[in-house]
């Protein structure tokens, strides 16, 4: 499969811990409801799933934030719950309620019915990946993604989002054998799903462990991290264009487990806003010329509700907290990809995002001149 050559590879260079002219930036949920143009496209599509399952609409909304802001990567417009939907759990999005499943997985009989889905049921996702990659025309790289095995299990057991994760944790503690069976199937499903995205043209892939942070120490390592490792072990390392495909792992609330994640078989670790970038760099960032992880994050998304000058101030603080940028182009070293600590709020003023992007690019260039 051939695609246009990349004109801005800053994000991929940072993923590989290579020196860059500035700190690259993209935003979790950058294609979304804070953009009026997204709302207009969604209205035409009629529903969220109408948007996500239509290749033309998915391509259009993926590119919308790039038309507005000089971001350094695009991320596939989709949802983490497409995989359990393909398992036959019946995903729907009620207006104002978020996702829910018609079927839940809470007992032996339901677990026995689970299997890695036929990836052809997710063909709309892979067709969208190829369509977006072609539409980008080499402007910036395209990131594919999936939920983590644990995060998918949370929704599959609860049937929807949860405040206390009572049902999934009850199953985990009462019947760990069942939970391990769910997670093993999820891990193999996620690996197959991400590999199909890579084959379709994704240039990096990200595992969102959005609910890993709700677990107790010990439980996180057993029920979340172990299965993220299983996903990573099953991933293709080479993309459709013959280039290596960096892998990003983001665990919301996972900063306390950085020592456990130090040896994950991935290139980038995402951090939420509770983590200290300098401390994270010291634990996993590595030294110049040695092994390590690139770091991604981690400004509090709610900073974007402050006036633009405050947004700029906080963005500079995040860049400064990472420390001196790696500038030696002859070797690898600690690198930073700027992002939010979680997805952008639908109520965010777009002009505040513009202030963030401009500040990150200008201040990170200035840091490299010092």
Swiss-Prot record:
Top-level taxon: Bacteria
Pfam families assigned: URO-D
Primary location class: cytoplasm
Cellular localisation: Cytoplasm
Keyword Membrane annotated: no
PROSITE patterns noted in UniProt: UROD_1, UROD_2
EC number: 4.1.1.37
Residues at the site labelled Transition state stabilizer: 79
Function comment: Catalyzes the decarboxylation of four acetate groups of uroporphyrinogen-III to yield coproporphyrinogen-III.
Protein name: Uroporphyrinogen decarboxylase
Protein source organism: Delftia acidovorans (strain DSM 14801 / SPH-1)
Gene encoding the protein: hemE
